[in-house]
Amino acid sequence: MKKIITFTACITSITFAAFAQKIDAGKVPSAVKTSFAKQYPGVATKWEKENGKYEASFKKDGNTMSALFEKNGTMTESETDIKVSALPAAVLAYVKANYKGKTIKEGAKITKADGTVMYEAEVDGKDVIFDSNGKFLKVMKG
């Protein structure tokens, strides 16, 4: 019985560790905060830590955005929420064909540090990722 309780506690800990954790700005490395401030001056943010990276969530020019940083301050990507109707036609067609009866809850444009653009469609609790032309790439848990 003791082994079962210990095992359950371990699994629960691992499960919670896999999700993003909100953190106080004071716990964000100064290199990350400096990099964010250079790219988005004067913007207030909320911070989360997930898989060793720091995610800033904020609003800029009326857009809901987020930016992902390595511990050393290197930004790896930014994400801007967009209207579902602004997703490429190929994304809409893919979802219609492969998720019959489901609707896209949210859309986003992802820009990687190297300038590569991808799109994200949240469908049925999952993030469906597409390239810049709307070609399906992968599904991630939401």
Range-by-range predicted roles:
Residues 21-142:
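Mature soluble domains of exported/periplasmic/lumenal proteins and thiol-rich metal-chelating peptides
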Residues 1-23:
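Bacterial Sec-dependent N-terminal signal peptides
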